[in-house]
Amino acid sequence: MSRLLPLLGSRTARSLRPGPAAAPRLPSWCCCGRGLLALGVPGGPRLLGTHPKKEPMEALNTAQGARDFIYSLHSTERSCLLKELHRFESIAIAQEKLEALPPTPGQLRYVFFHNAIPFVGFGFLDNAIMIVAGTQIELSIGIILGISTMAAAALGNLVSDLAGLGLAGYVEALASRLGLSIPDLTPKQVDMWQTRVSTHLGKAVGVTIGCILGMFPLIFFGGSEEDEKLETTN
């Protein structure tokens, strides 16, 4: 029920938006106009139930917000709302029983790029930070403590993982600014094997490209240090 209440709220808000000189018109499909008017019109009067007039109500996508809205309705309004929710749920169940077509090649390509682009950033940052941190650890702490190159690389990987925890949100936000919205697929199409294969393939290709691009710090680290180590050992 909490899943359907936001849909009802958004539908009510659109249908109850007042014109320049006209009063808000109540929808013909429901008789509980007074309770929905208090919910749907932004800044409208909330004179029902125990909520004060200036107290903001929580969103209906939370259990507390849905409970407060239900308690603010009268018995006839609650029965009308329950009847409409049952009708909406029956329509949704009927649509789920229909056989869904597999995703088109265009949709699969969109799913591929939608999953590949963020993982390019993840792979790039992970590899670049690991190389830089591992090299600095080897040249500073490694000389003092005498740790091996593999131990320095492991510590660099630790730094890269810790940095990835904080940078993951920024990478996702940057990828969302590119205009890649969520693929328009039905729930059945999302669960199909074609979509899953395209999703995992996009992630794998994105990480591979990102890790290859993340090797660019090796350009700035010359081989003179390794040559000096070889000369000293010889």
Curated annotation (Swiss-Prot):
Compartments where found: Cell membrane; Mitochondrion inner membrane
Phenotype caused by lack of the gene: Knockdown leads to irregular staining patterns of perinexal proteins, altered calcium and potassium currents, impaired cardiac conduction, and intercalated disks structural defects in both cellular and histological levels. Hearts ultimately develop dilated cardiomyopathy, severe fibrosis and congestive heart failure.
Keyword annotations: Cell membrane, Membrane, Mitochondrion, Mitochondrion inner membrane, Transit peptide, Transmembrane, Transmembrane helix
Extracellular side: 132-138, 225-234
Keyword Transmembrane helix: yes
Tissue specificity comment: Predominantly expressed in the ventricular tissue (at protein level).
Gene Ontology biological process terms in this record: cardiac conduction; cardiac ventricle development; regulation of cardiac conduction
Highest taxon, organism lineage: Eukaryota
Cell membrane is among the record's keywords: yes
Residue ranges crossing the lipid bilayer per the database entry: 111-131, 139-159, 204-224
GO CC terms: intercalated disc; mitochondrial inner membrane; mitochondrion; nucleolus; plasma membrane
Function recorded in the entry: Essential for maintaining proper cardiac intercalated disk (ICD) structure and function as well as cardiac conduction velocity in the heart. Its association with SCN1B is required for stabilizing the perinexus in the ICD and for localization of GJA1 and SCN5A to the ICD. May regulate the function of the gap junction protein GJA1 and may contribute to the stability and proper localization of GJA1 to cardiac intercalated disk thereby regulating gap junction communication. Regulates mitochondrial respiration and mitochondrial DNA copy number maintenance.
PANTHER family: TRANSMEMBRANE PROTEIN 65
Protein name, as recorded: Transmembrane protein 65
Organism: Mus musculus
